[in-house]
């Protein structure tokens, strides 16, 4: 069976990025071409998906979710569509990524792995995830500790909060995930049934946090046994741009670089003619 790379992009396919109206998205074609070139290089299919690919999802626009939230829910909806294909595994990559010229084939690198994803250690996000799982989704007991202690690293590891910037899943994992997750036709009812349709915003450790894809994935981890397949994805596959480019001689090697936040996107635009940056990435 073959593999596929998915990227979510809700901008129009004919978007004119020279138009001032798209100024804030001027980074998109550079990242998109980097990811597409990588897919061609490793000879896998490359699919760009958006909210518009899910006609049954359009009712979501009647409710008070941000565009970002609605876009992240696509990471749940597409799992159902993946199961209708013949692909063996997928890698989902966030749009705001660029690929190193030295990056190996992500599927060959993880040929024996079914579920690769980084842990999400942000304390406020883990706490937010815990509240949604316990008080809204009723997926875990009120007294459950959402961390497990890793004796080897002497560190608390989140059970249900994983990082969705870059991840790999096999058909076996996805088949279990979709058995409990809503699809494009049921997600609105799912949100209603769990008192999430009014988009509650939580105050957690001084930060405002809302319900997104990570929380729905956490729900699936709690309701199934898929985490038995999970292995932590290495940092080089979801590296932050500061460590890749802004540490001088201490810059770290990477395979996929994540241009997180507005600063990350601006960094790329500011360095399109800088060989110290561009010689490292394929755009």
Indicate residue ranges for each PLM-predicted region.
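N-terminal anchoring/stem segment of glycosyltransferases
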Residues: 1-77, 81-86, 257-264, 268, ...
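A structural signal for short, well-ordered beta-strand segments and their strand-loop junctions
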Residues: 7, 45-50, 91-94, 99, ...
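Short catalytic/ligand-binding loop motif for oxyanion handling, primarily in non-cytosolic enzymes
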Residues: 14-15, 55-58, 99-102, 107-108, ...
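Short, surface-exposed amphipathic charged segments that create phosphate/polyanion-binding patches used
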Residues: 62-66, 130-136, 245-255, 272
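GT-A fold catalytic core of metal-dependent nucleotide-sugar glycosyltransferases
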Residues: 71-137
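Short, surface-exposed, charged loop/turn segments at secondary-structure junctions
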Residues: 107, 131-139, 181-192
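Short, flexible, basic/aromatic active-site loop/helix in glycosyltransferases
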Residues: 136-158
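Catalytic core and acceptor-binding pocket of nucleotide-sugar-dependent glycosyltransferases
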Residues: 154-271
